[in-house]
Amino acid sequence: MTSPLPTPTWQELRQFIESFIQERLQGKLDKLQPDEDDKRQTLLATHRREAWLADAARRVGQLQLVTHTLKPIHPDARGSNLHSLPQAPGQPGLAGSHELGDRLVSDVVGNAAALDVFKFLSLQYQGKNLLNWLTEDSAEALQALSDNAEQAREWRQAFIGITTVKGAPASHSLAKQLYFPLPGSGYHLLAPLFPTSLVHHVHALLREARFGDAAKAAREARSRQESWPHGFSEYPNLAIQKFGGTKPQNISQLNNERRGENWLLPSLPPNWQRQNVNAPMRHSSVFEHDFGRTPEVSRLTRTLQRFLAKTVHNNLAIRQRRAQLVAQICDEALQYAARLRELEPGWSATPGCQLHDAEQLWLDPLRAQTDETFLQRRLRGDWPAEVGNRFANWLNRAVSSDSQILGSPEAAQWSQELSKELTMFKEILEDERD
C-alpha cells in the first residue's frame, strides 16, 4: 500500500518558491555589465517574492494549460483550446488521451514571454507540482504565497485559472470542421483539436525506441550477430511535420520541447509484393529445400541456433525469445503454403513430383476438387501430424549442426518449447483439413 505524501510546511514551500525566483534573478544579474546599476536595482526590486508573484498572477492570464490545441490545425486559427482530463469513453476499444492516465502531461499555450509562470506552477515538490497544491486549496500553499490571506487567495484564483477556457468556447473559420451524420437528416458539426498531450507521449515512446540506450544496445548486438535479452522496434517511413517554423514556442510549450517536430506514422494499406513461387517438384520435402532455404527462414534458423547455444545465460527472456523464433518459423511455413496455393490446382499429381504424400496433401489442397482418392486421403489421413513431425525433425536438424546443442542440458527445455509450438502448428493444419 502506498503511503500518503507528507504535507509540506508553509515555510518549506515558501523557501522553495523563493529559491526558484532567486535562481531566475541570478541568471539575469549575471548578464549585466558592471556599470548597469539601475538595471540591477530594478531586477532586485521586481524579484522580491511578493512583487514577482503579483506580476506572475497578472501574466498567468496570458497562458492556458491544455491537452488539446487548435494552432497545429492552422497556425492562424483563433479559437478555444481545451484542458480535458482523461476519461474512459463509453465505447471500449477506442484509443485516445484517456489511456494515458497519470502519464498525461499537460501542454501550455499563449504568450511565450509568460512561460516562466508555467515553469513556476510546474515546480515539483514532494510528488506534486505547485499547481496541484494550489488546486487542492492547500492552506500551507496559500500561506507560502503571502502572509496576507486575502492576497494569497486572490493569487491562487489567478494561478488555477490557467486550466480554464478563456471566454466562451469558440471555433474559427480556419479550423477544420467535420459533418458527422445522425439518424435521419441531422448531423453533428465537429471541430477536431490536436491531441497535444497524447502526441507528446507517443513522440517520447518513438524517440526512446529509435534513440534510447536499450534500443541502441540491442541494435549493436544484432550487428555483432550476438543474442540479446530483448529486441528493438523500427518505425520505417516516418514523416516529420513541422509546427511553428523557426519559433515552435509560438505553437505550444510541448511543441517547443519537440523542436516543432510532429512524427507521423504511415497510415497506408500494405503494399504486397507478389513473390514468384515454383511448385516443389524435385525433392521429397519442402522443409529441407524450397522452404528451408528461403532468406527469411535461413535467418530465423541461424538466430535460433545461436539462442539454443546460450546455455550459460538461460533466463526467461532468452527462453521467450526462442519460443518467439519458433513461432515465426511456423508462420513462415504457413505463409509459404499459402503462396503455393496460388498455383494451378493439381500440380502435385504431375508424374515428376517427388514430394512426400503428406506434404502434397498439405500444400495442394484444391487438388481434392478433381481427385476423389486425394480427397479421401486428405479427409481421413493423419497428414497434419505427419507434416508437423517432418517440420519438427527438419527444424531440429537445422538448429543443431553441432553436437553441443543435442547433448546439452538445454535439450529438454528446447524439446518442451518446440512441442508447445508444434501442437499449435498441427492444430492449424487440422483446421485446414476441410
Curated annotation (Swiss-Prot):
Result of knocking out the encoding gene: Mutants lose phage DMS3 infection-dependent inhibition of biofilm formation while there is normal biofilm formation in the absence of phage infection. Decreased production of crRNA in the presence or absence of phage. Disruption of the entire Y.pestis-subtype CRISPR region disrupts crRNA production but does not alter phage resistance (possibly OLNs PA14_33350 to PA14_33310, and the flanking CRISPR loci), indicating this CRISPR is not involved in phage resistance.
Start and end residues of each stretch annotated as Disordered: 76-97
GO BP terms: defense response to virus
Record keywords, A-Z: Antiviral defense
Disulfide bond positions: none
Keyword Kinase part of the UniProt annotation: no
Pfam families: Cas_Csy1
Function description: CRISPR (clustered regularly interspaced short palindromic repeat) is an adaptive immune system that provides protection against mobile genetic elements (viruses, transposable elements and conjugative plasmids). CRISPR clusters contain sequences complementary to antecedent mobile elements and target invading nucleic acids. CRISPR clusters are transcribed and processed into CRISPR RNA (crRNA). Cas3 and Cascade participate in CRISPR interference, the third stage of CRISPR immunity (Potential). Involved in crRNA production or stability.
Family (UniProt): Belongs to the CRISPR-associated Csy1 family.
Oligomeric and partner information: Interacts directly with Csy2; part of the Csy ribonucleoprotein complex with a probable stoichiometry of Csy1(1),Csy2(1),Csy3(6),Cas6/Csy4(1)-crRNA(1). A Csy3(6),Cas6/Csy4(1)-crRNA(1) subcomplex is also formed.
Other facts noted in the record for this chain: In this bacteria, Y.pestis-subtype CRISPRs do not confer resistance to phage DMS3 or MP22, but instead are required for DMS3 infection-dependent inhibition of biofilm formation and possibly motility.
Name this protein carries in UniProt: CRISPR-associated protein Csy1
Organism: Pseudomonas aeruginosa (strain UCBPP-PA14)
Encoding gene (name): csy1
